[in-house]
Design a protein with these regions (language model features):
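Pyridoxal 5′-phosphate
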Residues: 1-406
Length: 406
């Protein structure tokens, strides 16, 4: 049975072109870029070239604004904690209730350390209120950290507007966006619409580079203290020997993503939309989370009422289909998704969510297979539910109401 991988918001297959670009730096040009001999200077040039290419793809004014890290979690920690250390006289942070744990938990840690953190709510579609955002800005606000696209629902926040409103209110406020899910999928122009963004995080393994490499954009003039201290690497902003093969792979992956982005975006959106329509037509009592909000072209998050998501995922896996119930970083937890709770998803559905996320390697045949098996999986699980009337194929009266208090 062929595996159908539909969990690309969790991680992606390394592109063959990326793998090929990395190979020489494992066994031939394996030198430390900080060393002084000629071969090492060659690997230093590889890092410099990767930095230039990534800066160009993102519209950064200066390659030195690109800081290489090990992952988006490190990039987010560096951005948030680095900004906090560099601006000790300001103690207020603004974020949202639906951030990835790599941002949310850092903000909660700052809160425990005495910072005042505002967690902005979202509406039932996952949208932020611009007026509520502006009201949250204060004279002591040091940082705004708002994701570009949500990893669970795919809902896209208006970072262009949010960053502009921030700078119009107070140019000294640092604006950070976690663009892990959007870089390579959506346009990101740090010299254009994103020109008010000071810090931007992303990760290689979400755009067909390997796990273990990420980057942080740091706009010139942004006050930020280093998160990792030691050597002089990365302009003394991030200590540690550069991971040359992975950095080369990251640059190649971003090149590929941007070269094919518009065509990939259109084709992948068609796959997503086709699956969405089939699910809505074939499964009763299902809702598409974020359906009417701007969304990533590859992401579909559905909640099936009166079904446990864990059961759906196990049965999908038995059919060779890889999907998710939310962030892979918290998938070991039995707690319901904080993102769906923030959207106000009903009790009967919040535990029954499944996320399908596609990439350039998915096909019409993949979607055909999911459409064939997923409705039947939901139907089979509902037969076991005390809240579902199997004869009428509808919820029982007052289904689930007695369990809301638990």
């Amino acid at each position: 049975m062929r595996t159908i991988y539909a969990d690309n918001n969790a991680t992606t297959q390394v592109a063959p072109e990326v793998y090929e670009a990395m190979i020489p730096f494992f066994t031939v040009d394996y030198f430390n870029p900080s060393s002084m001999y000629d071969p090492a200077r060659g690997t230093a040039n590889v890092v410099a070239d990767a930095r230039k290419r990534i800066a160009r793809r993102l519209g950064a004014a200066d390659p030195k604004e690109i800081l290489f890290t090990s992952c988006a979690t490190e990039s987010n920690n560096t951005a948030i904690l680095g900004a906090a250390k560099a601006n000790p006289n300001r103690r207020h942070v603004i974020t949202t209730a639906v951030e990835h744990p790599a941002v949310l938990e850092v903000c909660k840690d700052l809160q425990r350390s005495g910072y005042d953190v505002t967690f902005l709510p979202v509406d039932g579609e996952g949208n932020l209120s611009l007026s509520a955002f502006v009201r949250a800005l204060r004279p002591d606000t040091l940082l705004v950290t708002v994701m570009h696209a949500n990893n669970e629902t795919g809902v896209v926040f208006p970072v262009e507007q949010l960053s502009r409103l921030t700078k119009e209110t107070d140019p000294a406020i640092v604006f950070h966006t976690d663009a892990t899910q959007s870089v390579g999928k959506l346009p990101v122009d740090l010299g254009g619409e994103f020109r008010h963004v000071d810090l931007l995080s992303f990760s290689g393994h979400k755009l067909h580079a390997p796990k273990g490499v990420g980057a942080l954009y740091v706009r010139r003039g942004t006050r930020m203290k280093p998160f990792m201290i030691g050597g002089h690497q990365e302009e003394s902003r991030r200590a540690g020997t550069e991971n040359v093969p992975y950095i080369a792979g990251l640059a190649r992956a971003l090149d590929l993503a941007e070269e094919n982005r518009e065509a990939d975006e259109a084709r992948i959106a068609r796959l997503r939309d086709r699956l969405e329509q089939a699910i809505e037509q074939r499964i009763p009592c299902v809702q598409v989370n974020g359906k009417h909000a701007p969304r990533l072209p590859n992401t579909l998050n559905v909640s099936c009422h009166y079904v446990e998501g864990e059961g759906m995922l196990y049965q999908l896996s038995a059919e060779g289909i890889c999907a998710s119930s939310g962030s892979a970083c918290t998938s070991g937890s039995l707690e319901p998704s904080h993102v769906l709770i923030a959207l106000g998803i009903p009790f009967t559905a919040v535990h029954g969510s499944v996320r399908f996320s596609f990439s350039r390697y998915n096909t019409e045949e993949d979607v055909d297979r999911i459409i064939k098996v997923f409705p039947q999986i939901v139907a089979n699980l509902r037969k076991l539910s005390p809240y579902w009337d199997n004869e009428k194929n509808v919820p029982r009266p007052n289904a689930g109401q007695e369990s809301r208090s638990t």
